[in-house]
Amino acid sequence: MQIRKPRTSRALLDIILAVMGMIILLINVPGAKELVPPIKYMLTVSWEDGTTTDIDTHILTPKNKNVYFSQKNSGDVALNRDDLGSRGDPSDINLELISFRGLSNGIYYISIHNYRNNNRPTKFVKLELFDFHSGLKLYNNIVEAPIEGEELPVFKFFVKNGKITTTEESNRYVIGNSR
C-alpha cells in the first residue's frame, strides 16, 4: 500500500517560503543605510589593576544627556564596558570603554566619579581618547583619583560636522547637571 502525502502540507510549505522570502527582502533592502553607524572615536578610562576601586565615567552630550553606568546609551555615545573595580568582575583589569558614533555638533564633557574605594584605593586614573580608525590619540592624561564619593571634571571636546576638532581641560561637573 502506498501512502499519499496530503497536498495541504505542500501548500503550507509554499506559503512559509513565500513569507520568508518577503522577510528577507525587507531585511536586506539594496541601498539601505546602516542601522547602526560605525564607531568613530573610543574613550578608555583605566586605573590600577586588581584594586576594588569603582571609578565611573560620565559623559555629558550636547543634548544634555548623561551617559554613565545607569544610562549606558544616548544614541551617539555608549558605555560599552562598565568596570566595577574587581568586585563581581571576572577580570582584574580595571577599564571602562566608551564608543562614540555619529556625533552631534557641540561640546562633550567628560568627568570621573569615585563610586566605591574599598581596601586598596587607586591613586591615578588614565583617560585616552582615540580616533577609532586611525588610532591617533586625541587626548591622553593621567589624573589623581578623586576621593570616594567625589566627582572630578577632566576634559571636554568640541565636535563640528561629526568630527572632534579640539580637546581641552574642563571644570564642569557632569553629575551636578544630570540630577
Regions found by a protein language model. Name each.
Residues 1-18:
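N-terminal Sec-pathway targeting helices
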Residues 21-179:
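Intrinsic-disorder/low-complexity signal
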